[in-house]
From Swiss-Prot:
Allosterically activated by GTP. Its cofactor is Mg(2+). This is Uracil phosphoribosyltransferase. One of its GO terms (molecular function) is GTP binding. Pathway: Pyrimidine metabolism; UMP biosynthesis via salvage pathway; UMP from uracil: step 1/1. It is an enzyme of class 2 (transferase). Binds 1 Mg(2+) ion per subunit. The magnesium is bound as Mg-PRPP.
Amino acid sequence: MIEDKRWKGVYSFEDSPFIMEILTQLRDKNTDSIEFRKGLVKLGRYMGYELTKTMEVEKVKVETPLEETEGIIVKDRRNVVIITVLRAAIPLMEGLIKVFEHARVGIVSAVRGKAPEFKIEMDYVKIPQIKPEDTVIVADPMIATGSTLTRVLGEVKKYGEPKRTIVLGVLAAPEGISKIKSEFPDVEIFVAKIDRELDHKGYILPGLGDAGDRAFGEPLKLSTLPQVHHIE
C-alpha cells in the first residue's frame, strides 16, 4: 500500500504484484465478460483484505484445545457499510462481502452524462442508517471525473456521520481524485492504481474501457431494434 504524495489520504496498491496481475488481466481488451467479472470480484476481496490493515484491532484472550493464548479481532470489520454504485461495482461488492461479511449494503444508481457537462442522473438510492462507529466503503471501479462519486458522497452524508468514509476503486485519474478531495477532504481513497489522465470524453487513460459494459455486456439501445410491422 503506497500513499500518493500529491494528496492526503490517497493510496494505491501498486506494490502488490498479485493485485497488479489482476489489473493487467482487466486492462486486456481480449478478456471476456466472465473473466472480467471474476477479476473484479478478486480485486474487491484482496483490496478489502488490504483495508483491514488500516482498521482498529483489539487484543483478546482465546482458548485453544490446549491452553489460553492471546489473539486479536479487527473491530472495525464488524461495523462496515458498503455503498455499491450500479452497475459496475456489483462484482467489487461481491469480493468485499467475502472480507466484511457483517456489512450492511446500500445501493445507488448513478449515471454520468456526456462531455462537457458530465451531468449526473441519480434515480435509485437505498442506503441503511449510518452510525458513528461505522466505516463506509463506497465501491466504484472507475474514478474518472469524480462527478459521480462526489454526488454519491453527498447523498451518503444524509444518512449519518461515520467513523471513516472510504472510496474504493480499481483505477483513478488525477482529475477525479482532486475533485473528490476538494469537496470531501476527509474521505480516504484506495485504488489499485492511479492512471495518467482523462481523455476529452472523460475516460481514464490508459484505463480499461467501460467497466460496466465489459463486466455485463454493452446495453442494447431500443432505437437499434428492428421495427415490427403489424398486419391488420
